[in-house]
Curated annotation (Swiss-Prot):
Pfam families: Proton_antipo_M (PF00361). It is a multi-pass membrane protein. GO terms for cellular component: mitochondrial inner membrane. GO terms for molecular function: NADH dehydrogenase (ubiquinone) activity. This is NADH-ubiquinone oxidoreductase chain 2.
Amino acid sequence: MVLFGVLTMILAIALFSLRIPAIYFNRITIILLLFSALLSYNSLYMNNIGSGVGVFGGLFQVTTITQSIDVFIYLLGALVLLLSEKANRANTLSFNKLNSTLVNKSKGLSVLAEYPLIALFSVLGMSSLISSSDLISMFLSIELQSFAVYILATIYRESESATSAGLKYFLLGSLSSALILLGSSLLYSFTGLTSFEGLYMLCSTTETNTAIEISVLLIMVGLLFKVSAAPFHNWAPDVYDGVPTVVTTWLTTMPKIAFLVFILEFQGFTQLANWSSWTNLLLISSLLSLLIGTIGGLAQYRIKRLLTYSTISHVGFLLLALAINNEESVESFLFYLIQYSLTNINVFFILVAFGYLLGSKGLSIYSPIQLINQLKGQFKVNPLLGLSLAICLFSMAGIPPLVGFFGKQMVLYAATHNGNFFLAFVAILVSVVSAAYYLRIIKVIHFDPVPAPSALSLIKTTEISSDLNVTETNNSLEGSSEELSTSSSLVIATITLLLIFFIINPTPLLNSVHLITLNLFYW
């Protein structure tokens, strides 16, 4: 369905982009993703899907977990695309027929007609990746979604910081793809096989070969690079901070889901979890991610860089669950991935909402909220948004009874039950330390006074002018703020309520991840 949508959108944009406002393409894409989610959900009731259904000559294998994650990816993709719809009223928008964009007269923002198309390409690559059962389909899927996110990072060509960040993303992402391709080539040269099933049979019947181990570890290093796990994380803070906030929302959430689920399936298909070298690599990366993500975040004063280091820390929890690879850990991995993805998206929804409230006082037309100090006193401006952000940050910190606490508790229980007491202790320690920078944001929002216009001007001329990553500043401090759209308000309210009231009825989500885990291990 997504492939059909991609082909249809290519034709529609080519033929009708000069006559149809670009925002309509965005809404059509959202409807398409929702319908794709419905189709994937219905496919879960097929009789043979539990054991896996091979398609395209075995290049892809459709299973319960692939279809379940497809539903999640499609729904999240539809939510993120809502952010690209401007919160302006209809009379403040005009259609520019020269470049097929919908232009906001007050600030020069635009909704690109190509944005939803590229997002669809990215979703298609993610869906293909988690269903891959062959080295060839794996690499093609990785490149399909990678090229899409490279373009997304640089799609706003007026932004110099986004162009710089996108170039860095492309160059270093190409390096990780080269490592994956090198590992795949070596693996094929040593085994003569590309299918995961064939590799599983070979590894089960023969002794472990050092050359094969090196090949697989090269693939794993490339995948860890893609999810910005330490020590392969250095590109992430600059890239996520440089691109527009709307694009950052996509980059920090969507690709990571696909890559992490693929790692889970890859080690399940090939029984790599039984290799000590594979497990040790995951454990070392998990430990470094926990430490670097926490310590690095303490020194940040830019909100998106801080959230990037927070993401690195959470990736450490996910890698810890992957390294253990038993029923408890896989269940905790899926639960943690779902709850963190929802929380992270909600945080960026709220940041975009605060950017609307700032209006022309924002530091950039693409990323109005860049500094933590810009959020001073925003609780007094909009108490509900301030409270929602506090709830999300408390959940990320693992404060009970929010859903983030149960995610960390499940991972730590699996780690201690498997004998990884040291890593469990480190995870508890970094959770306590990371609460410091979450509480710093909450303190700025709720207890600091609203800065005067002169203070905002000082921020512009001193802090921002010295930062090479920010060049699209909005020089006007006067002007009205924009209104938050009803759809964005509904998304923020719904996710926030889910974080709060999960404890009242946790059965649906817990049962779902439990059934997926049982299917993965016992079908």
